[in-house]
Amino acid sequence: MFNSISGILSGKTTDSVYVENSGIEWEIFVSALALDTLGTVGKEVKVYTWLYHREDQMRLFGFPNQAERSLFLDLTKVEGVGPRQALKIMSGLNSSSLEKALEEGDIDTLQKAPGVGKKTAQKMILALKGKLTNLNKVSSKGQASVSCEYEDIVT
């Protein structure tokens, strides 16, 4: 529904940022690592978003770039990992470490993320190894590779 929100970063908490745009202040939930990436209060910011809607609540989740949003959405595809858990995982591991651990099946690294035990790490690897849809993947030749999601269509 919302791809991104640009505006003035008007505040930060431990798990969210506030972005003021055209007289509306948006509360956007972000990972702890994204808090530092998004800049300082009072500055212009662009936050890529994903809207979570249930019958009893709506939450807007934010990311400093589209690649992190894509990784977040991949994590939410894992059984037992909802949006809040995915954000916690991304607070404990940066996106490159997380992607590497998933691709290599590194359970020990995944368990360093908050709330991830051995079973959850195994589920994450089983569900996502070789299937990450990150838009910014680059092949060893320096060319952008085709997203795994669409690779079957191309070949």
Language model feature labels by segment:
Residues 1-77:
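Structure-specific DNA junction-binding interface
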Residues 124-155:
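Strongly charged, low-complexity linkers/loops
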